[in-house]
Amino acid sequence: METHKTSLVILFLILIFAVIHSGGAALRIKAESFMGPRLWRLCFVSFSLPSAIVLISYFLAHRYDGIRLWNFQGNNFVFLLVWFLTAISFLFLYPATYNLLEIPSVLKPKVRIYGTGIMRITRHPQAFGQIIWCFAHTLWIGTSFTLITSCGLILHHLFAIWHGDKRLAIRFGEEFDNFKKNTSIIPILAILEGRQEFKIAEFFRLSQFGILIAIGVLWWSHQYINIAVKTFNSSFLSEFFN
Protein backbone atom coordinates (compact mmCIF):
# COMPACT_ATOMS: atom_id res chain seq x y z
CA MET A 1 0.00 0.00 0.00
CA GLU A 2 2.84 2.37 0.87
CA THR A 3 4.27 1.82 -2.63
CA HIS A 4 1.12 3.27 -4.19
CA LYS A 5 0.42 6.03 -1.64
CA THR A 6 1.38 8.77 -4.08
CA SER A 7 -0.80 7.16 -6.75
CA LEU A 8 -3.83 7.61 -4.47
CA VAL A 9 -2.85 11.24 -3.89
CA ILE A 10 -2.57 11.97 -7.63
CA LEU A 11 -6.01 10.40 -8.22
CA PHE A 12 -7.41 12.69 -5.52
CA LEU A 13 -5.77 15.71 -7.20
CA ILE A 14 -7.20 14.65 -10.58
CA LEU A 15 -10.65 14.39 -8.97
CA ILE A 16 -10.35 17.94 -7.60
CA PHE A 17 -9.16 19.17 -11.00
CA ALA A 18 -12.06 17.40 -12.73
CA VAL A 19 -14.67 18.78 -10.33
CA ILE A 20 -13.37 22.33 -10.82
CA HIS A 21 -13.26 22.06 -14.62
CA SER A 22 -16.42 20.08 -15.29
CA GLY A 23 -18.28 21.79 -12.45
CA GLY A 24 -17.19 25.18 -13.73
CA ALA A 25 -18.37 24.29 -17.22
CA ALA A 26 -21.74 23.17 -15.86
CA LEU A 27 -22.17 26.41 -13.90
CA ARG A 28 -21.04 28.68 -16.72
CA ILE A 29 -24.43 29.73 -18.12
CA LYS A 30 -25.93 30.59 -14.72
CA ALA A 31 -22.72 32.19 -13.47
CA GLU A 32 -22.34 34.38 -16.57
CA SER A 33 -25.93 35.59 -16.26
CA PHE A 34 -25.22 36.58 -12.65
CA MET A 35 -21.75 38.15 -12.84
CA GLY A 36 -20.98 38.47 -16.55
CA PRO A 37 -18.68 36.35 -18.76
CA ARG A 38 -15.45 38.27 -18.00
CA LEU A 39 -15.74 38.11 -14.21
CA TRP A 40 -16.79 34.46 -14.35
CA ARG A 41 -13.79 33.62 -16.53
CA LEU A 42 -11.45 35.30 -14.04
CA CYS A 43 -13.08 33.46 -11.12
CA PHE A 44 -12.85 30.16 -12.99
CA VAL A 45 -9.17 30.68 -13.85
CA SER A 46 -8.37 31.63 -10.24
CA PHE A 47 -9.45 28.12 -9.20
CA SER A 48 -8.54 26.03 -12.25
CA LEU A 49 -5.02 27.35 -12.80
CA PRO A 50 -3.75 26.65 -9.24
CA SER A 51 -5.31 23.16 -9.34
CA ALA A 52 -3.54 22.45 -12.64
CA ILE A 53 -0.20 23.76 -11.32
CA VAL A 54 -0.42 21.61 -8.18
CA LEU A 55 -1.43 18.55 -10.22
CA ILE A 56 1.42 18.96 -12.72
CA SER A 57 3.96 19.70 -9.97
CA TYR A 58 2.98 16.62 -7.97
CA PHE A 59 3.10 14.46 -11.09
CA LEU A 60 6.60 15.67 -11.99
CA ALA A 61 7.84 15.13 -8.43
CA HIS A 62 6.53 11.56 -8.22
CA ARG A 63 6.50 10.32 -11.82
CA TYR A 64 8.99 7.54 -11.03
CA ASP A 65 7.10 6.33 -7.94
CA GLY A 66 5.46 2.93 -7.68
CA ILE A 67 6.58 -0.11 -9.65
CA ARG A 68 8.78 0.09 -12.75
CA LEU A 69 6.73 -1.74 -15.38
CA TRP A 70 9.12 -1.30 -18.34
CA ASN A 71 12.09 0.82 -19.34
CA PHE A 72 12.44 2.06 -22.93
CA GLN A 73 14.55 5.08 -22.00
CA GLY A 74 17.71 5.01 -24.05
CA ASN A 75 15.85 3.58 -27.05
CA ASN A 76 16.17 6.20 -29.80
CA PHE A 77 13.10 4.98 -31.70
CA VAL A 78 10.90 5.24 -28.61
CA PHE A 79 12.40 8.66 -27.82
CA LEU A 80 11.47 9.99 -31.27
CA LEU A 81 8.04 8.33 -31.11
CA VAL A 82 7.29 9.96 -27.75
CA TRP A 83 8.19 13.43 -29.02
CA PHE A 84 6.23 12.91 -32.25
CA LEU A 85 3.14 11.79 -30.32
CA THR A 86 3.56 14.68 -27.88
CA ALA A 87 3.66 17.17 -30.76
CA ILE A 88 0.53 15.61 -32.28
CA SER A 89 -1.22 15.68 -28.91
CA PHE A 90 -0.67 19.43 -28.63
CA LEU A 91 -2.41 20.00 -31.96
CA PHE A 92 -5.44 18.27 -30.43
CA LEU A 93 -5.13 19.66 -26.91
CA TYR A 94 -5.14 23.37 -27.59
CA PRO A 95 -7.95 24.45 -29.95
CA ALA A 96 -8.68 27.12 -27.32
CA THR A 97 -5.62 29.02 -28.59
CA TYR A 98 -7.76 30.08 -31.55
CA ASN A 99 -9.12 32.81 -29.27
CA LEU A 100 -6.16 33.64 -27.05
CA LEU A 101 -7.47 37.02 -25.91
CA GLU A 102 -10.59 35.41 -24.47
CA ILE A 103 -8.57 33.31 -22.03
CA PRO A 104 -7.52 36.29 -19.83
CA SER A 105 -10.86 38.02 -20.66
CA VAL A 106 -9.26 40.79 -22.74
CA LEU A 107 -12.00 39.90 -25.23
CA LYS A 108 -15.43 38.82 -24.01
CA PRO A 109 -15.39 35.01 -23.52
CA LYS A 110 -18.01 33.26 -25.62
CA VAL A 111 -19.11 29.65 -26.09
CA ARG A 112 -18.97 28.71 -29.77
CA ILE A 113 -19.43 25.69 -31.98
CA TYR A 114 -16.33 25.25 -34.14
CA GLY A 115 -16.73 23.28 -37.35
CA THR A 116 -13.32 23.80 -38.92
CA GLY A 117 -9.72 22.70 -38.43
CA ILE A 118 -9.15 20.00 -35.86
CA MET A 119 -12.91 19.77 -35.23
CA ARG A 120 -13.31 18.13 -38.63
CA ILE A 121 -11.19 15.25 -37.30
CA THR A 122 -12.98 14.93 -33.93
CA ARG A 123 -15.37 17.22 -32.09
CA HIS A 124 -13.56 16.42 -28.84
CA PRO A 125 -9.91 17.12 -29.72
CA GLN A 126 -8.84 17.83 -26.15
CA ALA A 127 -9.91 14.37 -25.00
CA PHE A 128 -7.93 12.59 -27.71
CA GLY A 129 -5.00 14.95 -27.29
CA GLN A 130 -4.92 13.92 -23.63
CA ILE A 131 -5.13 10.23 -24.54
CA ILE A 132 -2.21 10.56 -26.98
CA TRP A 133 -0.17 12.53 -24.42
CA CYS A 134 -0.85 9.95 -21.71
CA PHE A 135 0.11 7.05 -23.97
CA ALA A 136 3.37 8.73 -24.99
CA HIS A 137 4.48 9.67 -21.48
CA THR A 138 3.43 6.38 -19.92
CA LEU A 139 5.43 4.59 -22.62
CA TRP A 140 8.49 6.70 -21.83
CA ILE A 141 8.35 6.79 -18.01
CA GLY A 142 7.05 3.26 -17.55
CA THR A 143 5.98 3.38 -13.88
CA SER A 144 2.77 2.30 -12.20
CA PHE A 145 2.34 5.87 -10.88
CA THR A 146 2.36 7.30 -14.39
CA LEU A 147 0.04 4.57 -15.65
CA ILE A 148 -2.46 5.28 -12.85
CA THR A 149 -2.19 9.03 -13.48
CA SER A 150 -2.86 8.50 -17.18
CA CYS A 151 -5.90 6.32 -16.45
CA GLY A 152 -7.29 9.00 -14.15
CA LEU A 153 -6.79 11.77 -16.72
CA ILE A 154 -8.31 9.69 -19.52
CA LEU A 155 -11.37 8.82 -17.41
CA HIS A 156 -11.87 12.52 -16.69
CA HIS A 157 -11.75 13.36 -20.39
CA LEU A 158 -14.09 10.50 -21.33
CA PHE A 159 -16.59 11.96 -18.87
CA ALA A 160 -15.96 15.39 -20.41
CA ILE A 161 -16.96 14.02 -23.84
CA TRP A 162 -20.40 13.06 -22.54
CA HIS A 163 -20.71 16.18 -20.40
CA GLY A 164 -19.58 18.48 -23.20
CA ASP A 165 -22.07 17.09 -25.70
CA LYS A 166 -24.86 17.38 -23.15
CA ARG A 167 -24.06 21.03 -22.35
CA LEU A 168 -23.77 22.05 -26.00
CA ALA A 169 -27.03 20.27 -26.86
CA ILE A 170 -28.84 22.22 -24.14
CA ARG A 171 -27.24 25.51 -25.13
CA PHE A 172 -27.42 25.34 -28.94
CA GLY A 173 -30.21 22.84 -29.63
CA GLU A 174 -30.71 22.20 -33.35
CA GLU A 175 -27.42 23.88 -34.28
CA PHE A 176 -25.52 21.34 -32.18
CA ASP A 177 -27.62 18.47 -33.57
CA ASN A 178 -26.52 19.44 -37.09
CA PHE A 179 -22.92 19.82 -35.92
CA LYS A 180 -23.09 16.39 -34.27
CA LYS A 181 -24.35 14.77 -37.50
CA ASN A 182 -21.36 16.14 -39.44
CA THR A 183 -18.66 15.29 -36.89
CA SER A 184 -17.52 12.28 -34.87
CA ILE A 185 -16.12 11.56 -31.44
CA ILE A 186 -13.71 8.94 -32.81
CA PRO A 187 -10.98 10.73 -34.82
CA ILE A 188 -11.32 10.64 -38.64
CA LEU A 189 -14.50 8.52 -38.51
CA ALA A 190 -16.74 11.28 -39.93
CA ILE A 191 -14.23 11.86 -42.76
CA LEU A 192 -14.10 8.14 -43.60
CA GLU A 193 -17.90 7.97 -43.59
CA GLY A 194 -18.17 10.96 -45.94
CA ARG A 195 -19.91 13.20 -43.40
CA GLN A 196 -16.91 15.52 -43.21
CA GLU A 197 -13.97 16.60 -45.35
CA PHE A 198 -10.39 17.36 -44.37
CA LYS A 199 -9.11 20.82 -45.33
CA ILE A 200 -5.38 21.17 -44.70
CA ALA A 201 -5.47 24.94 -45.34
CA GLU A 202 -7.44 25.43 -42.11
CA PHE A 203 -4.39 24.32 -40.13
CA PHE A 204 -2.18 27.07 -41.51
CA ARG A 205 -3.08 29.81 -39.08
CA LEU A 206 -1.23 31.85 -36.48
CA SER A 207 -2.59 29.89 -33.54
CA GLN A 208 -1.14 26.63 -34.91
CA PHE A 209 2.22 28.35 -35.35
CA GLY A 210 1.98 29.33 -31.69
CA ILE A 211 1.47 25.68 -30.76
CA LEU A 212 4.62 24.72 -32.67
CA ILE A 213 6.54 27.38 -30.72
CA ALA A 214 5.08 25.98 -27.48
CA ILE A 215 6.30 22.49 -28.41
CA GLY A 216 9.79 23.88 -28.99
CA VAL A 217 9.74 25.71 -25.67
CA LEU A 218 8.61 22.56 -23.87
CA TRP A 219 11.42 20.56 -25.49
CA TRP A 220 13.90 23.16 -24.25
CA SER A 221 12.34 23.41 -20.78
CA HIS A 222 12.56 19.67 -20.05
CA GLN A 223 16.14 20.22 -18.91
CA TYR A 224 14.76 22.23 -15.97
CA ILE A 225 12.28 19.62 -14.73
CA ASN A 226 14.60 18.59 -11.89
CA ILE A 227 14.80 22.21 -10.72
CA ALA A 228 11.00 22.40 -10.70
CA VAL A 229 10.84 19.12 -8.78
CA LYS A 230 13.32 20.34 -6.15
CA THR A 231 11.33 23.56 -5.76
CA PHE A 232 8.10 21.62 -5.23
CA ASN A 233 9.72 19.14 -2.83
CA SER A 234 11.03 22.00 -0.69
CA SER A 235 7.64 23.73 -0.58
CA PHE A 236 4.89 23.44 2.04
CA LEU A 237 2.75 21.59 -0.53
CA SER A 238 5.12 18.64 -0.56
CA GLU A 239 5.02 18.44 3.24
CA PHE A 240 1.22 18.74 3.19
CA PHE A 241 0.73 15.85 0.76
CA ASN A 242 3.26 13.69 2.58
State where each predicted segment sits.
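Membrane-helix interface motif
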Residues: 56-65, 225-233
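A generic, lipid-embedded transmembrane alpha helix
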Residues: 42-62
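Transmembrane helix-loop junctions and nearby membrane-interface residues
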Residues: 22-25, 56-63, 94-101, 138
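Membrane-interface interhelical loops and short amphipathic "cap" helices
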Residues: 1, 65-73
